[in-house]
């Protein structure tokens, strides 16, 4: 591999990590919740702070990016990202972690704003730079939860940020090897207004991805009871399908690929909304549909928005800000929606659990103490998590009595079904966002999709 290729790879990986950071800590949230004295809302800010700060800073940078050198933007961003990653790994309180994640968001905005012109310079052309930047960003967004889950399971949550530090360091070194001679004097030109329909579609698709990258991950961990690395294996269907979509996208007209991607993403989210309890095969298929949709729609849409006349730096910065703004707004709506549905789902689960025990073919002398133990376990379990009934059923004789074991199996299945259904409205909300993305794609597509 040539020196130039190594420099391109270093910057591309940094771009992928900056996009992955939107969701990379999702599978680590249970460990963070247990590690720090905080609330569920506090832990959620570990995700929200990064995305919110990145969105705000990227949108603000659109107004000033034409006064800066791309090398300087990239170097400053990677340096901040590097320092913030180390601070995240060393954080000993939830407040410090959220503050460090906010600085990461600022660094990510600068990194992503400067990386595209640098990739164009290193790659030999603007078109090649756009292609590399788009592919890295799409794959990074898709692989985030799986990568974070694997690192959390193999080491602990701090490993997520330890891993990011050398990536940022390599990108920082790469900035000194790129030669972007001119200052990016590319203000808010008319060409930026022509990207509005495409950016609206990207914002809606990014919001829809909340269902896949956040809600779907929480479902397989908290409801299905998978470990972080098992969850990582399941959600790895998303980046795998995203890569598989690449040759298909190349073979289709751009407008067809983008519209098909939005439809497939919506279909995958509808599939997640109607999961038949903890069916991993059905879940994998739904994740794969979402990944195919992501791979077909987002790269083509991003490439279209960034192409054409006008400077790429302002357009890339605007696109980054809009994408993360869509994600933050979807989180702001979807998270409270899910929280309310989980409370209602917990009540339904208790009623259904009572019915299972009453209908069970076991003696009344076993039912009464078992029902009391089950009630206590349900009260103690966090909303959205399936309690561990093993001890209660072991005491009731599940190891030797097939009837008691059958009640246990029926109970777990009933509660899983009730809690899984609690996710349905949130998944359908995200599917609606993907479907709404078809409006700018179909209405304005002929004007800006080649």
Regions found by a protein language model. Name each.
Residues 1-7, 207, 365-450:
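Transmembrane-helix exit segments and adjacent C-terminal regions of multi-pass membrane proteins
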Residues 1-175:
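Transmembrane-helix bundle of Major Facilitator Superfamily
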Residues 4-29, 36-50, 55-66, 71-74, ...:
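12-transmembrane solute porter fold
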Residues 77-82, 106-116, 137-147, 172-184, ...:
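Hydrophobic alpha-helical transmembrane segments
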Residues 165-186, 437-445:
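C-terminal membrane-cytosol helix-exit motif in multi-pass small-molecule transporters
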Residues 177-184, 221, 306-310, 444-450:
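Juxtamembrane transmembrane-helix termini
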Residues 349-367:
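Short extracytoplasmic/periplasmic juxtamembrane "stem" segments immediately C-terminal to an N-terminal membrane anchor
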